[in-house]
Amino acid sequence: MSRAVLAPFEAYQKARVTFVQTVAELAQRPQNIEALQSAGVMALLRPLLLDNVPSIQQSAALALGRLANYSDELAEAVVSNEILPQLVYSLSEQNRFYKKAAAYVLRSVAKHSPHLAKAVVNSGALDALVNCLEEFDPSVKEAAALALSCIAKHNHELAQAVVDAGAVGLLVLCVQEPELTLKRISATALSEIAKHTEELAQAVVDQGAVPYLAALISHPDAQLKRYVCQCLSQIAKHTVDLAEVVVEAEIFPRILNCLKDIDVQVRKNAATCIREIAKQTTELAKLIVHSGGAAATVDYISESKGNARLPGIMTLGYISAFDDSLAMAVIVSKGIAPLKDALMNEPEDHLKAAAAWSLGQIGRHSPEHAKYLAEADVPSRLLAVYMLQESSKDLKDKSKKALKNIIQMCTHVPALEPLLQLAPNNILTYVCAQFAKVLPQNLEAKRTFVQSGGF
């Protein structure tokens, strides 16, 4: 073939390469997106996905992924231009570089909303993505697992579709692979599946995920520990049986070490996992306490600030709620002080409310429990929060309930006395009723009461 004939074809190929690589480069910068969209870039990139030059196909897919990643409007444009079926078809036909780029587009579309994720599912992408989990190349597995995670995260129907496509068993295998990034992404995907319903969490358990996840609690990588603790908490939260599966994987006492981790999110996710187990049954709460979990949680709350404290605060409340011995274990572990600190010093009302609730759970069991709270000046602090005009309704309700729980058990007269002067009528009712119970049994308090004219 003569040079004169080949020249225009070579020039055309070079122009396509230059165009698609430049567009992919421009699509990395948000300030270019609107101009690219106005120039009709989607329609120009679409035929290049079927180009006979592999590098052009890959660059076209990469550019589309970057555009779709930018906004749901552009992701919608990918769907409306019927680009998804082409990508899905090519996923099973092309090389590993194209598969990564195609999975990136699917992920970039699916991440925005359930509607767009559903469009990805309807395009037949799930089977193709699941097949990619069996590829030899770890980076292809990573891209596919991330796309599946972005689909599953939205709702239980989409997560169920991922399960039905056979993804879970392969994701569990990916967790066992040596590549760190693949472990992280696979643990995240399993978490996104398990979080929705008991049945989906059971599907993850049935594929043997828990022992492999539990073994990674002690891994040195902080990001992996974050995702592992999160996944275990998403499994444990649903039922007693699922929580027991997590516990039987011998996460205690190893997960308590995560409460001291240098990474804030590892600490919070570990605390959340412990909370989800603690809330289930008395037996599980006792197991946590006997493993040193109460003391470790107290330390965690003491060393944390803001929303990171919440799972620890709730854990102490759940443990204390079950019975008097568990509540006493929280007291002995010096749990009152950090809960009181959260009640007084946290700026967010939902944290104060959680602390109030937990203090109420500690104090409701017996006069001895209530006395520990009274000696720490908790009742007057709860009253102050309750009477604060800026307090939310939920905070007022929980403070009032906690006060009632503590007052009705309190026989420590010095703690009740200030409440007589400060409490509004609806709280004063509980205080007076408690005095009526206490004074006949306490001669010294009765004498003081009479001599002072009623305090």
Predicted regions: what they are:
Residues A4-V23:
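N-terminal alpha-helical scaffolding segments that mark the starts
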Residues M1-S2, L316:
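Universal eukaryotic N-terminal targeting presequences
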Residues V5-P8, L44, E76, A102, ...:
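Intrinsic disorder/low-complexity segments
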Residues V17-P30, L44-P47, Q58-S71, Y89-S90, ...:
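Alpha-helical solenoid repeat architecture
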Residues S2-E10, A43-L50, P54, P85-S92, ...:
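HEAT/HEAT-like alpha-solenoid repeats
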Residues S333, P338-V385, E417-F455:
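Ankyrin-repeat and related helical/solenoid repeat scaffolds used for protein-protein interactions
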Residues A7, K14, N32-A39, I56, ...:
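Short, hydrophobic/charged alpha-helical patches characteristic of ARM/HEAT alpha-solenoid repeats
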Residues L64, A75, L106, A117, ...:
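Intrinsic low-complexity tandem-repeat regions in disordered proteins
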